[in-house]
Amino acid sequence: MRTRIREFRAKYGMTQEELAKKVGVRRETIVFLEKGKYNPSLRLAYKIARVFNARIEDLFIFDDEELWGK
């Protein structure tokens, strides 16, 4: 899964540490999310989207193969 978290953080002038504190995770979790090495829970995805006043699908991008297992 690809994410646009880094892009949104830059737009809001926010560090990984600041975002992590806002959503209640460690900075390393944000690092892994941004690198596509971790799929967030629905709850975490929702929290991150709320921080940026965005929709979950604006931040997390699935390709069809990932989504449908093709």
UniProtKB/Swiss-Prot annotation:
Residues 16-35 bind DNA. InterPro entries: Cro/C1-type_HTH, Lambda_DNA-bd_dom_sf. The keyword Lyase does not apply. SUPFAM superfamilies: lambda repressor-like DNA-binding domains (SSF47413). Keywords: DNA-binding, Transcription, Transcription regulation. Residues 5-59 form the HTH cro/C1-type domain. The keyword Acyltransferase does not apply. GO terms for molecular function: DNA binding. It holds the Pfam family HTH_3. It comes from the Archaea. This is Uncharacterized HTH-type transcriptional regulator AF_1793. It comes from Archaeoglobus fulgidus (strain ATCC 49558 / DSM 4304 / JCM 9628 / NBRC 100126 / VC-16).
